[in-house]
Amino acid sequence: MRTLAIVNLKGGTGKTVSAANMAHILAALHRKKVLLVDGDKQGSASRYFSVYGEHDGTAALLTDPERDPAELIYSTGYNGLDAITSNMELYTTDRELWADEDDNHVMDLRRALDRVRNDYDFCIIDNGPAADIITLN
């Protein structure tokens, strides 16, 4: 699985639109299996594909690295395109992980996504406009 992260520390630059369109084009036109990871607390990519939820998603994956990521993957309704959602829980999770001095969480997301790497051709990560734990992952 090839992973592409869309990052810019400025808001309103088209990160979500770029990530969502790239994911959809890879799935629809190139027939690739794509996992879109919403790494923005606002959950814009999740809303884009109407899979926004109040629970689970990226925050749950980061707070419980042993959790099976397959439990957190939602179908977007588009063939070949799945998503791990995000919401404001990611804000709290980010603060908790930064405060945890006993562990280095920089590779948690990567380790979790490694468990589904054989299920997808691409992973597109939509990051928020911040240098937070999800962006560093």
What are these regions (language model features)?
Residues 1-137:
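P-loop NTP-binding core
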